[in-house]
Amino acid sequence: MCKIVYLTTRRFDRASKLFRDALANELRNRGVEVVTENAFDIFNRFRQHRTYGIAIAFDFYRDGKQGSGLTLNRNCSYIGRDFAYNLSNDYDRLTPMIRWRDLEFVDSDNKRWFRFFNKVSASTKAIFYLCTINNEYDWNNYNVVFPDVVKLFADEIIRCLRSNYNVDNYRQRVKSAKLKIHKVQE
């Protein structure tokens, strides 16, 4: 199985790139091969098709409302759904003041999905909207926990890679990680 992680953002989105690069550095420090690219646009229209293990896109809402969101493909694998579910739950525990406002299941030809994952194949794909960037309350809460969010994403990605994309193995790893966290907190 492919153990390469693909991280992408929109080309001119500074905040998303900051998170993507911080996560990429954290994963590289842990020995994971990471590819970072910009989303599909006129400048990279002729890139070749690639296959990765995990593909994640990062973006922010810009409508002034409050909250974060998650977008998955309608035909995503069980490991992809479990991975996104665990990441969203852990992100929710870390940032309870940023509420989830959107969970979408889209087709592959959806405009946003196509922009981020055109010519990319992966066992696990997801688009995370980390918060609303032009909502001051959301943005401040996100910036306070920024290093912890990077570590959270890195931990979950490592867990998924070590399971070799086996759903049962991944669920066991998540369960044992939660038990370790509860023991440390007590």
Question: Where are the language model's segments positioned?
Answer:
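Active-site-adjacent mobile loop/cap segments within catalytic or ligand-binding domains
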Residues: 5-6, 55, 65, 105-185
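Active-site-adjacent substrate-binding region
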Residues: 78-107
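A domain-level signal for caspase-like cysteine endopeptidase catalytic cores
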Residues: 2-36
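Structured segments of extracytoplasmic/periplasmic soluble domains
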Residues: 22-33, 86-97, 156-167
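Active-site microenvironments of hydrolase-like enzyme catalytic domains
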Residues: 2-3, 7-10, 38-85, 108-134
